[in-house]
Curated annotation (Swiss-Prot):
The keyword Ion transport applies. It comes from the Bacteria. It is a peripheral membrane protein. The keyword Iron-sulfur does not apply. The gene is atpH. This is ATP synthase subunit delta.
Amino acid sequence: MKLDKYAVGQRYAKALFSLAEQEQQFESIHDEIQALETIFNDNPKLGTVLTDTTLSGLKQRNLLESLSNDFSTLMQHFLSLVFDYQRMAEMPYIIAAYEDLYDQHKGIAHAKVTSAVALDDDQLAKISQSFAKREGLNEVLIESVVDPDIIGGIVLESNHKVIDGSVKHGLDQIKSLLLK
């Protein structure tokens, strides 16, 4: 059975995460994962190039080595394993899955806060602290979005949860009740 890219990402990320913890390189591997993410974002076709059968294996290996020269031995071995199993095209999925595991371990969540007007840093910090406390998290990293259509209030989205405290949502609920 062929695994989808998401499942591949999960498996490889779990293995790397576990090994990083075991080798007490948790933070340094996370830093290297972030560096890899930047490399793959800057070069979106890199994974495809490293799995392309029309290129010689030696050229691909040399490219991989030049890419990973500044990384730890653990990360170099991991990248070599991913390369040997021809999974470099799935590297963005591996990176995303590793970031998710890291965030879970550290008690970090990402949230999108939508408001009718731009919120200042103090307001965003209060929302972040309040949501972190409510959810038992250490930190909530907020992306702020302005959408005048919500009229007022905020809509917070995080980890498949939506807390809709917008005026538009309240008006829609009242309208729904009146039309019954």
